[in-house]
Regions:
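C-terminal helical/coil "lid" or tail adjacent to the Rossmann-like core of SAM-dependent
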Residues: 3-4, 10, 14-24, 170-171, ...
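A short glycine-rich, Lys/Arg-flanked "PGG" loop and its adjoining helix->strand segment in the class I
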Residues: 132-147
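Core SAM-dependent methyltransferase catalytic element
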Residues: 203-206, 276-285
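Conserved catalytic/acceptor-binding region of the Class I
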Residues: 150-221
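Class I SAM-dependent methyltransferase SAM/SAH-binding core
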Residues: 55-57, 61-109
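Conserved class I S-adenosyl-L-methionine
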Residues: 1-50, 63-67, 87-90
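A short acidic, Gly/Pro-enriched loop at the edge of an enzyme's catalytic core
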Residues: 108-118
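A short SAM/SAH-binding and catalytic strip from SAM-dependent methyltransferases
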Residues: 117-132
Length: 285
């Protein structure tokens, strides 16, 4: 059952137009399957203990709910909160005894203060127009001595085309141009994720630490890797919407690299080498 007590009657759009009706489900599921080894290791390194009460703030399609619950079972609990109804429908697949989900805006979720021992929040805080306000709200939900972990992918630009840094740079610039136009953002908005450490310090939290790992994939790829790169990146993040931001020749070359039916399809190249950073900042209340 999905608890909708916190659902906004008139959802306010987030920085990237997020509302209760926004659906990134396929992209989130693809990312979580792709990055599962690294995400699981990041969670295991947090030294959670059985019996802890955990909040997954911005739980998306819910894959991490089960991973977190494994760390606090048998008598711990995990609550997942997300604004999107579609995401929480997908998260149903990960429900089990001790795991619940709630549809709500993070800033207005009907959760008691000082009710959690640990908060996990990945690729979420910078969807808010006021990230610092979001961190302060989450911190208020922690018990004394509780910890919050903010995870963020891609603090550094991802590497897709190791053999062609020029096309990679132009593609990344085209993506930024699209987001600037589509969501009326400026360059500071688009690079704000790099300020994760500063945000935690500005929130006046204690014992702030930060660690970055590299998600690295080379040919031959696992099916989950290929699905994420082709569907979530090549098709959904890039695709036809980048046409207007690239020259005809560059767009044609990019299209060939992203097309499974083309002889130049990037994911079949023996020299395919992908790098993405994943950063986790941890702080104590």
């Amino acid at each position: 059952m999905i608890d909708r007590r916190g659902s906004p009657k008139t959802p306010a759009g987030g920085l990237l137009g997020d509302t209760a009706f926004r659906d990134y489900s396929s992209k989130l599921q693809a990312f979580n399957a792709f990055a599962e080894p690294e995400l699981r290791r990041a969670i295991a390194a947090l030294n959670l203990a059985p019996g802890m009460h955990v909040l997954d703030a911005g739980c998306g399609t819910g894959e991490a709910l089960a991973w977190l619950h494994e760390q606090v079972a048998p008598n711990g609990t995990v609550v997942g909160v997300d604004l999107s109804a579609a995401h929480l429908e997908a998260a149903r697949d990960h429900l089990r005894p001790g795991v619940t989900i709630l549809q709500a805006d993070l800033l207005g979720a009907p959760l008691p203060v000082q009710s959690f021992d640990f908060i996990w929040c990945v690729n979420t805080i910078h969807h808010l127009r006021e990230p610092l306000q979001g961190i302060n709200r989450l911190a208020s939900l922690l018990r004394p001595g509780g910890r919050i972990a903010l995870g963020q992918s891609s603090l550094l630009p991802d590497m897709y085309f190791a053999w062609d840094a020029r096309l990679e740079r132009l593609t990344n610039e085209a993506v930024r141009s699209y987001y600037r136009e589509r969501y009326a953002l400026d360059e500071r908005d688009l690079t704000a994720v790099r300020g994760l450490l500063g945000l935690l310090n500005r929130a006046l939290l204690q014992r702030v630490t930060i660690r970055t790992v590299v998600i690295e994939r080379t040919a031959p790829l696992r099916p989950a890797d290929g699905a994420y790169l082709h569907e979530a990146i090549f098709r959904q993040t890039w695709g036809a919407r980048l046409r207007r931001y690239l020259s005809p020749a560059d767009y044609a070359e990019l299209s060939a690299l992203c097309n499974p039916g083309h002889p130049q399809f990037a994911l079949r190249r023996p020299d395919f080498h992908f790098l993405q950073t994943f950063t986790v900042g941890v702080a104590e209340i």
